[in-house]
């Protein structure tokens, strides 16, 4: 997807979500004449959450339409009459500004690539915040720094040529998944333990290692 198309899609999804959430009457002609000024004061995190809500909501609506159209039974309606009935029952009950072509294009966009859309929705559900959960992903502004940042030291694999950072060891008494908890485990991580038992651990900046 081109960058410009992706930007326009994001804007339309967020706006459509707001229209559905606030239950404001809308017409099919509104799909390409949307005013996004009300989103200008939102933070990046708020905009991202709006996008997640919009995708989840649209996924449910598309699933309902598919379920209705594929359920067993004889449908007396077909063609334009069936499209109007589905629009009135599942989208909005005002047909005064019914635009068949725009609705067909909107639905076709999702139905033709439903597998990719379902995959996107399934991944997004893991980003939903849970009550009292520490797994919610916060949205931050990009960090302009040349040094590569490693935000998860627990995933760093110790090698024979690299000592464990001091901050890594400090967490070992609190987190069972980070750092060694005994000298035996420390030796497995190639920590050099000298015969001098005095004093706390001091970082050796010249070698980038830890002296004990």
Swiss-Prot record:
It comes from Babesia bovis. The sequences of the gene BABR proteins are nearly identical, differing only at their carboxyl ends. This is Gene BABR protein 3. It comes from the Eukaryota.
């Amino acid at each position: 997807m081109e960058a410009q198309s992706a930007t326009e899609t994001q804007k339309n999804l967020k706006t459509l979500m707001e229209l559905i959430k606030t239950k404001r009457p809308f017409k099919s002609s509104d799909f390409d004449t949307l005013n996004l000024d009300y989103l200008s004061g939102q933070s990046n995190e708020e905009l991202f959450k709006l996008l997640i809500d919009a995708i989840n909501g649209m996924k449910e609506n598309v699933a309902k339409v598919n379920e209705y159209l594929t359920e067993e039974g004889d449908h007396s309606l077909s063609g334009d009459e069936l499209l109007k009935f589905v629009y009135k029952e599942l989208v909005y009950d005002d047909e005064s500004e019914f635009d068949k072509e725009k609705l067909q294009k909107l639905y076709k966009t999702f139905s033709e690539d439903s597998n990719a859309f379902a995959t996107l929705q399934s991944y997004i559900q893991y980003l939903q915040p849970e009550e009292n959960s520490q797994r919610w992903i916060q949205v931050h502004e990009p960090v302009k720094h040349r040094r590569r940042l490693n935000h998860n030291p627990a995933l760093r694999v110790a090698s024979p040529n690299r000592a464990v950072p001091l901050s890594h060891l400090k967490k070992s008494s609190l987190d069972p998944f980070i750092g060694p908890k005994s000298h035996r485990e420390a030796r497995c991580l190639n920590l050099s333990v000298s015969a001098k038992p005095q004093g706390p651990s001091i970082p050796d900046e010249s070698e980038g290692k830890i002296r004990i």
